[in-house]
Amino acid sequence: MASFYTTLGERILKYYYSPLRKKYSFFEKWKIIFTKPSACENCGTQVKAIYLTPILGYLFTKGKCPSCEIKIASHYPILEFLFGILFCIFLSLTNNILFSLSVLFLFGHVLVSMITDYKKFSLDYENLPFLLFFGVLSNFLFYNQFPDFIDYAVFTGFVAFYILLWVFYKKGIGLGDVIFAPVYAFLAGHPYWILFLNSSYILAVLWAFLSRKKGEKLDGKPIPMGFFFGIGLLISFLGKAIMAR
């Protein structure tokens, strides 16, 4: 599952954020993104089915393309492993297999947004309906109820706050953040939106501090907030699961 969503994010980058975006029509791009068989990005050799096996496929190939022997990015098996660990953690905390599975689909789509924002400082808006669907489904399977008045109040508050922030401090926030932050806060729910917000910005500031060049000021340094919003949402869902024990 992790490799599917990682590949999805990378193909969106390739066909929407590179010169190829002008080569294909809207429908042609999505057809390629969803139906093109997995292949080596260097030589184009199609990946055999056995090599698509999570984690094991990477070991079978010894981390290299069998044809051109270029190294396969290590983030594929790492993310596959992390998704498996996440499933086990949520299942052990909640004993709810349907919730644990739906959370993986939710964070698969979160991963797509994290990839596009980290690479291009752009959030994939077409991803929003899927984020909302799997997020609401996960919360329903967890709480056995749909969003209530407090959840909508959290969403409304975040929308108002981020619109004001965007209007009066445009250089410090992007439109994608204005759209995605309220949605993530809505999915985190009350009171876990506090955990989502604080963890997102704490991690973002730490990243900015640690990644800055010598003598570079933090003020004005571009930060892929969508990436850290994704981590913050994961932390908030883990918080829910832990507190429900």
Residue ranges of model-derived segments:
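A membrane-topology feature that recognizes alpha-helical transmembrane segments
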Residues: 1-245
